[in-house]
UniProtKB/Swiss-Prot annotation:
Keywords: Aromatic hydrocarbons catabolism, DNA-binding, Repressor, Transcription, Transcription regulation. This is HTH-type transcriptional repressor NicR. Pathway: Cofactor degradation; nicotinate degradation [regulation]. One of its GO terms (molecular function) is DNA-binding transcription factor activity. The gene is nicR. It comes from Pseudomonas putida (strain ATCC 47054 / DSM 6125 / CFBP 8728 / NCIMB 11950 / KT2440). It comes from the Bacteria. InterPro entries: HTH_MarR-typ (IPR000835), MarR/SlyA-like (IPR039422), WH-like_DNA-bd_sf (IPR036388), WH_DNA-bd_sf (IPR036390).
Length: 158
């Protein structure tokens, strides 16, 4: 678990608290913007951004348990279960019992899922481009670096 900043250790700041200037609020707005762009630009209008991330994780890591997908996608257990069910209903993934532990289910990309993923890659590149909006090359590198740094500091603290 990461160390929490307590009020006594937080820097004193007497300026009024403006939620619209806080990192969580700004990240949420940026994510909402990205999600809207994804839905408008996706080659498959039925595919959500997190379903796309899940398909990418399966492509990158191969057949995976739901626990492995949770780690690869940063999605909680209840959400990943629903994502997998929706992808299965579209025959983009298939499920099979884990040979090492029959209680576990292994999720695997189907040929249809791999084909959709291949078709989506050019769209995904365009979505990323649009999501970055008017940021110049240096700003794009900086924002990705800073986001990774925020994530890495949280993972290293645990």
């Amino acid at each position: 678990m990461s160390k929490k900043t307590t009020p006594s250790s937080a820097p004193l700041d007497n300026t009024p608290y403006d939620v619209t200037e806080q990192v969580g609020h700004l990240l949420r707005k940026a994510y909402q913007r990205h999600t809207a762009i994804f839905q408008q630009q996706a080659c498959d209008p039925q595919l959500t951004s997190i379903q796309f991330v899940t398909l990418c994780a399966l492509r990158d890591h191969g057949p995976s348990s739901q626990a492995e997908l949770i780690k690869a996608t940063a999605v909680d257990q209840a959400t990943i279960r629903g994502i997998v069910e929706r992808l299965k209903a579209r025959e983009l993934v298939q499920l099979s019992p884990d040979p090492g532990d029959r209680r576990k289910v292994i999720v695997e990309l189907t040929e249809s899922g791999a084909a959709l993923l291949d078709a989506m890659i050019p769209c995904a590149r365009q979505i990323s481009e649009l999501s970055m909006g008017s940021l110049n090359a240096g700003e794009r590198v900086a924002i990705l670096y800073l986001l990774r740094k925020m994530i890495d500091s949280d993972e290293n603290a645990g």
